[in-house]
């Protein structure tokens, strides 16, 4: 297997870390992604959990420096159960929101319910996804979960959110348009 000692450990350059921390008060949101690059175990004896915790330690510094900062986790197809576990147990509790598609949601549902992947009822997909989203929201404590696939978007938000449903809908429409344009390119 291919092993890149930097890119597949989510190592942030010291220059980036210093710069982001210096200017973090100018940001309202910070998107966290890239966990699909991790490996479960590394030749040096470290694990994905070591690098997940290292990244979260830095994100905590950003939040301490600028408490209003919102952290958004954008999911991707993750290659190993150990990484999914690390995301569910360590990453999501630190996030304010997340975005994911049906494949990624199915992994979370599988993990939460101790089921095999792709056990969804093809005739009741929306019900399956919606119940899985609610279960994930309850377990994770996330304020917002954005579910997106080619057929529809669903956004679960906590009632304590200060953003109106109309503004949430407008944001979802905009993201749908952008995603559609990217598909055409």
Task: Cite the ranges covered by each PLM segment.
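Ribokinase/PfkB-type carbohydrate-kinase core domain
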Residues: 1-185
């Amino acid at each position: 297997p291919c092993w890149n000692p930097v890119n597949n450990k989510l190592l942030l350059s010291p220059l980036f870390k210093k710069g982001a921390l210096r200017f973090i008060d100018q940001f309202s949101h910070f998107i966290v992604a890239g966990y699909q690059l991790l490996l479960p175990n590394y030749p040096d004896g470290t694990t994905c959990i070591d690098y997940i915790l290292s990244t979260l330690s830095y994100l905590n510094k950003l939040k301490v420096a600028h408490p209003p900062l919102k952290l958004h986790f954008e999911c991707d197809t993750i290659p190993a159960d150990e990484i999914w576990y690390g995301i569910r147990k360590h990453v999501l509790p630190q996030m304010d929101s997340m975005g994911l598609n049906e494949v990624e949601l199915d992994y979370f549902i599988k993990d939460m319910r101790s089921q095999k992947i792709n056990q969804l009822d093809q005739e009741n997909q929306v019900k399956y996804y919606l119940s899985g989203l609610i279960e994930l929201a309850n377990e994770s404590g996330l304020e917002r979960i954005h579910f997106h696939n080619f057929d529809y978007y669903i956004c679960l938000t906590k009632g304590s959110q200060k953003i109106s449903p109309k503004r949430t809908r407008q944001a979802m429409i905009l993201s749908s348009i952008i995603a559609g344009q990217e598909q055409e390119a």
